[in-house]
Each structure stands twice: as C-alpha cells, then as structure tokens.
Amino acid sequence: DKLNALLIKALVSTGELNEVETYDVDFDHQFLETEKYDAKPTYKKFLGYRPGVYVIGDMIVYVENSDGNTNVRFYQAETHKRFFALLEANSIRVNRFRADCGSCSKEIVSEIEKHCTHFYIRANRCSSLYDDLFSLRGWKTEEINGIQFELNSILVEKWEGKCYRLVIQRQKRMDGELDLWEGEYTYRCILTNDYDSSTRDIVEFYNKRGGKERIFDDMNNGFGWNRLPKSFMSENTVFLLLTALIHNFYKTIISKLDTKAFGLKETSRIKAFVFSFISVPAKWIMTARQYVLNIYTENRAYARPFKTGFG
C-alpha cells in the first residue's frame, strides 16, 4: 500500500495528476509467466502471477499482485475499493472507467459505480440474452477502423434491481459458417451507465482500451516484468511497483525532453533513451583553475543542459 501511495504521490508531484481535472482509468490483469518458487498454474497453461494494473493515460497508478491460479474476480471489488480510496485521499477524480469482462459481476460493478461518472465494461454473454439480441430491430451500420459493424443498444436488468444500458456490436462472420448460438454474426456487448453517448462513441471509446496493451509490452520488454528477479511473490511485487515508478518518471522526462535533438521519439523505449542520453562517456577535467565536465560526443544537444559560464 505504501508503494502504491508513492506511485500516486509521485504523479501528483510531477504534475501528471491534479485535483482540477478528471481522468479516465483502465483496469486489466496482466499474466506474467515465471517459474518462481511460489508461482501457480494459470488458465493460460503456464506458471506465473496475475497482477491487476490500473492505468491513467500512459501512467501506471496502482498495482496489486495475485497468484496465477486465482479467478480474476476473486476479491476484485476489494481491490477497486482500495484503489479508489487511495485516489480520493489525493483528491483525484475519475470520469470514466474501462475494464474487460473479468469485471462484469454485480458486486464489482456496484463498487466501481460508486467512484466514477461512467463505466464501460465488456459484458459476458449468457443464453438468456440471445433471445433479446435476435429480436432486436433498428440496427445501425457503422464503419469503425475500416470494418463494417452493426450497432444497437437496449436497457437490461443484468442483475435484480440493477438496470443498465447494453451497447451491442455485431459483425458478420468472415468464414461464412453459422454458430450454434450466434448464427451468422459475432456479438460483443458493453455494459455501461452512460445513457447519453451514441453507440458509436461508446464502442470507439472502449476500443481505445486496446492501446493500453502497449504499456504492458513496454513493461515486459523494457522494465523486466517478463524476467522477474526474485523467488517469492511479495518480493516480485515490490519489483513490479518500483519499475512502474521508474516507468512513470521516464514518461514524464521524455515528454519534457527535446527528443529530436537526441535522436529519440516520445514513443522511444527506455533502452534507446539510455543508449542515446545516459551511456555517453564524460570526464571532469581541470582547466583555468576550475573543473569542467568534458563530454565525448558529437551530439550538440548536450551543450544546452551542461553549458556553464566557462563555455
């Protein structure tokens, strides 16, 4: 909890989070393959851990680790409760919340709904829902990212006493084969309490959640999440949190750095940053009765940050 609090306080201190704005939060579980002493078998058929990760923009704001063999809904509502309590303690407000179907349960949705304006959660389909889907009329054809979809929405009582909007997206099967339950279409549903936005806006907003996979790819390959160093989950959880802290600092630095001068981009991995900006030979030399940092590089971008009155 202290390291998660440090994550958020560091983001507040660097100006990435503030009390004025409201933020969109993404939540997902990342399965990490590792053969550590206490690693458990996951449903993906490898040993590992299953940390739940919260992301705002490109920043990781909260990490809570779990055994690989635990169900994704196991005590998830309590995890959300701790996360939102930490945000609210720092006066950070959440506008919209996105998650996959692992968060689609009455207890979890009720907890999320308390702390955000709108939520968008991939709904798990059930046999009782198909009758409603097949009888729907008024489908609107929309082209999203070059693919033709048909969109619709209905109000459903997903759980007793709880009525939400269900945004439905269907696409004709590419192979032309008929499915036993879905027929000639593939159906995807989004459960939300947003009753004003259009179906297209909701689908497009939810689809942007896929871009957060790039953050996990960066953490796996650039910050060592796919090569955990310790033998036990508690120690590796500390590693996950510390590398998340470094990742956030790196993103802040790279956003304020003149990246082009160093041959970098804002999307450059930390390895490229280290090679271009840090791994440069330098030596303190005495000249004119004072020490001057002599940097051995042809990159003139170093002249500005290290320029002194001497030269």
Protein language model regions, located:
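Active-site-proximal, Lys/Arg-enriched surface segment
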Residues: 1-53
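Short, conserved catalytic/metal-binding motifs centered on acidic residues
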Residues: 21-31, 58, 94-104, 119, ...
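Electropositive, glycine- and tryptophan-enriched low-complexity nucleic-acid-binding patches
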Residues: 44-90
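Domain-level cores of phosphate- or acyl-group-handling catalytic modules
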Residues: 70-130
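An anionic, glycine-rich sequence signature occurring as long contiguous blocks
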Residues: 118-221, 307-311
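Short amphipathic alpha-helical "interface-anchor" segments enriched in bulky aromatics
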Residues: 199-238, 242, 246-250, 254
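A short, flexible helix-boundary coil/loop motif
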Residues: 250-311
